[in-house]
Amino acid sequence: MPAPILPLIEAASRWPERGALVGLDLGTKTIGVAVSDPDRRLATGVETIQRKAFKADAARLLAISSERKVVGFVLGLPINMDGSEGPRAQSTRAFARNLANLTDLPIGLWDERLSTAAVERELIGMDVSRARRAEVIDTHAAIFILQGALDRLATLRRSGQ
């Protein structure tokens, strides 16, 4: 049976209380990958996968999830500023459906609006060269996405929701 694909809060109810999560920033040419600690406090960059074919991309993601003993995925969903979903969001949902057929780990979708732009501004502020930014931006966007999701879940836990 395919893994469930749900909004973040609903996916979190399917994950065990402890266990690492994988955060993904899905691009057309690359996939930025980040992983949380088992207590879900901190997101750390793992790698940027150069996209080839879905099977190869998925095999690498599943290998990372196995190596890191993760309990779920957080996939950045590129929602338009007006709240609608465009072609990139549809492509992300299709990727999630295909990945869900290969794993039983619940997949949480998290609004990634402006994540790459925010990371780009941060890297520019740190005086990172354009060439170096191109190398690291996808992994940093995955960190940004996953950390945002972790922070939201922590806020909900603290408020008892």
UniProtKB/Swiss-Prot annotation:
Pfam families: RuvX (PF03652). The keyword Nucleus does not apply. The keyword Chloroplast does not apply. GO terms for cellular component: cytosol. CDD domains: YqgF (cd16964). It is found in: Cytoplasm. Its EC number is 3.1.-.-. Gene3D superfamilies: YqgF/RNase H-like domain. One of its GO terms (molecular function) is nuclease activity. GO terms for biological process: rRNA 5'-end processing. Keywords: Cytoplasm, Hydrolase, Nuclease, Ribosome biogenesis. Its main location: cytoplasm. NCBIfam families: RNAse_H_YqgF (TIGR00250). Could be a nuclease involved in processing of the 5'-end of pre-16S rRNA. Belongs to the YqgF nuclease family. PANTHER family: POLYNUCLEOTIDYL TRANSFERASE, RIBONUCLEASE H-LIKE SUPERFAMILY PROTEIN (PTHR33317:SF4). This is Putative pre-16S rRNA nuclease. It comes from Bradyrhizobium sp. (strain BTAi1 / ATCC BAA-1182). The lineage of its organism: Bacteria, Pseudomonadati, Pseudomonadota, Alphaproteobacteria, Hyphomicrobiales.
